[in-house]
Amino acid sequence: MKDPELISWTTLPNIFLVATTDSGKVVGCIAYKQVNFDTVELGRNSVDKEFRRLGIGQKLLRTILKTAKDNGYETVLVSTSIAQLHAQKLYEKMNFKFVCFKPSLFHPLFTYLTGLKAMEYKI
């Protein structure tokens, strides 16, 4: 049985990319999901711990930003938290800007304590 959320991320106009080794092992992934006619939101961003600090995450991010631009999108959104400091630094390095603390479905204190924030990239 397939993951229903994953299916929604892989149905056009949504995009799901993977990074693999020469032997075909998947070591990273990234996706975007269309929010509206000119905006997509990143998700499913991950690199296997054994393969981090090799530039794979940056290459995946560059590739998906180019894909978004090539498909006519103007804005790319991403949500991250204080627990994902390495991801925040990568997004900032790639010119994402902090927009706001993202409201969540949880109590506002949860959002505050986790530092759940939204970042934006203009193409």
Language model segments and positions:
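Residues that form or flank phosphate/diphosphate-binding pockets in enzymes
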Residues: 27, 55, 86
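Acetyl-CoA-dependent GNAT
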Residues: 1-43, 48, 61-62, 101-104, ...
